[in-house]
Amino acid sequence: MLNFNIFLVGPMGSGKTTIGRYLARITGKNFYDSDREIESRTGVSIPVIFEIEGESGFRQRECKIIAELVQLNNIVLATGGGAVLAAENRRELSQRGIVVYLYAPPKQLYRRTSHDNNRPLLRTGNPLERLKCLLKERDPLYREVADVIIKTGKQPVKAVANEVLRQLRQYKGGAPQRKSFVHVKSNKGA
């Protein structure tokens, strides 16, 4: 049994919400998405929060939500792509569960996000270039906090979730030691 929380980090479009829901279902854990929690509690969408409060206002809300959610037990939490920007979020995630970094290359992220109007940071003339810049800035932070790194590429949700579980099951008898393993799933052609 996986008796620890699973926290998913990674760029927008890496599959955190989709894979997180699937992981929660097959492990019997409760699923939370920090962005959806923010929307639910404010009653408005993320783009509206960005319009009214700017990115800094949104990040403050995100820190509060993450600090609250990581106190729960038996959960899978999909964080927003920029959650790792705040040192307190990285600390909270590291201390309260196992952090899985879902990595995908920028072109794959672009294909997954290009038709989603709910992503204020991609409202730019060149969303692919913006994704590349965001990944360059955030990748070191994702890697810093990650216990496990999984390359999602073009793999189906079930395959990625099963790879996450395979890695997590290597820990037997309680919560794992941080940084005990890191695995990058190769996916040639992605």
Curated annotation (Swiss-Prot):
Keyword Amino-acid biosynthesis listed: yes
Highest taxon above the source species: Bacteria
Binding-site list for substrate: D35, R59, G81, R138
Origin species: Nitrosococcus oceani (strain ATCC 19707 / BCRC 17464 / JCM 30415 / NCIMB 11848 / C-107)
Protein localization: Cytoplasm
Binding-site list for ATP: G13, S14, G15, K16, T17, T18, R119, Q155
GO MF annotation terms: ATP binding; magnesium ion binding; shikimate kinase activity
Gene3D superfamilies for this protein: P-loop containing nucleotide triphosphate hydrolases
Protein name: Shikimate kinase
InterPro entries registered for this protein in UniProt: P-loop_NTPase (IPR027417), Shikimate/glucono_kinase (IPR031322), Shikimate_kinase/TSH1 (IPR000623), Shikimate_kinase_CS (IPR023000)
Database matches in Pfam families: SKI
Main function: Catalyzes the specific phosphorylation of the 3-hydroxyl group of shikimic acid using ATP as a cosubstrate.
EC number: 2.7.1.71
Record field: catalytic activity: shikimate + ATP = 3-phosphoshikimate + ADP + H(+)
Principal localisation: cytoplasm
Residues holding Mg(2+): T17
